[in-house]
């Protein structure tokens, strides 16, 4: 089943076409990343509805927080760094809430581009609007054309970025790698070179086994 709670919409959208999987997509009350902790009650209330009304197994589910690193929408690097280190596991974070922060540089459109472009991780954009403009100029890059083959290409771009930046990583314990990515990307942006195109969304697919990584690539 698929359950969706959009920002500023009172109702939930539910689809039961796939009875073998359960996915819930929830917007924070505001689009800014600080809403993760500043509006905790809102998310807690949504989780309660999912548990009680839709029998969604929140406590046994992988939780991911997807946000853009676009410096115009998320302006507090120190807070982002804090979330990278504390939201480090989709299931359990000791004394902190469950969930893994997945950043895209500069925005989630990076994942879409990486589905359709080889060496996409060498493209550079400063803002999410730049990535959207690139997509608008390349009409073959379309979300409805994403397939198993294109997702594998995106996964390869994910891995190639890590290799090219010499970032050691463990798929199940990715916090240190995520922090290294953030540090390198911030330095690139502050030097005026923009962000290298990169999305951590692939990490979720690897952690959940939707995409499997060959041993020789690790």
Q: Model regions: which residues?
A:
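Residues that form generic nucleotide/phosphate-binding pockets
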Residues: 2, 49, 111, 115, ...
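RecA-like P-loop NTPase motor core
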Residues: 1-52, 57
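Residue-level recognition of the N-termini of beta-strands and the immediately preceding loop/turn
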Residues: 11, 60-63, 97-100
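Activity-critical C-terminal alpha-helical subdomain
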Residues: 67-168
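Short, flexible coil/linker elements and helix-boundary hinge sites characteristic
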Residues: 5-8, 52-57, 94, 124, ...
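Extended, basic/helix-rich recognition subdomains
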Residues: 143-218
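Glycine-rich, often proline-containing surface loops adjacent to acidic residues and nearby aromatics
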Residues: 57-69
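Hydrophobic, Leu/Ile/Phe/Ala-enriched alpha-helical segments that form helix-helix packing faces
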Residues: 2-4, 46-54, 84-92, 205-217
């Amino acid at each position: 089943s698929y359950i969706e709670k959009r920002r500023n919409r009172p109702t939930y959208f539910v689809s039961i076409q796939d009875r073998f999987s359960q996915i819930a997509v929830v917007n924070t009350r505001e689009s800014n990343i600080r809403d993760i902790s500043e509006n905790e009650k809102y998310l807690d209330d949504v989780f309660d509805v999912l548990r009680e009304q839709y029998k969604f197994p929140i406590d046994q589910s992988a939780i991911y927080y997807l946000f853009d690193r676009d410096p115009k929408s998320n302006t507090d690097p120190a807070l982002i760094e804090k979330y990278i280190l504390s939201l480090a596991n989709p299931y359990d974070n000791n004394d902190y809430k469950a969930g893994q922060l997945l950043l895209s540089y500069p925005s989630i459109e990076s994942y879409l581009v990486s589905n359709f472009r080889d060496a996409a991780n060498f493209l550079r954009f400063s803002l999410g609007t730049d990535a959207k403009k690139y997509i608008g100029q390349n009409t073959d890059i379309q979300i409805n054309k994403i397939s198993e083959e294109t997702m594998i290409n995106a996964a390869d771009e994910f891995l190639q970025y890590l290799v090219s930046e010499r970032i050691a990583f463990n798929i199940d314990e990715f916090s240190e790698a995520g922090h290294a990515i953030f540090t390198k990307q911030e330095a690139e942006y502050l030097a005026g070179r923009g962000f290298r195109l990169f999305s951590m969304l692939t990490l979720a697919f690897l952690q959940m086994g939707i995409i499997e990584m060959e041993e020789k690539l690790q």
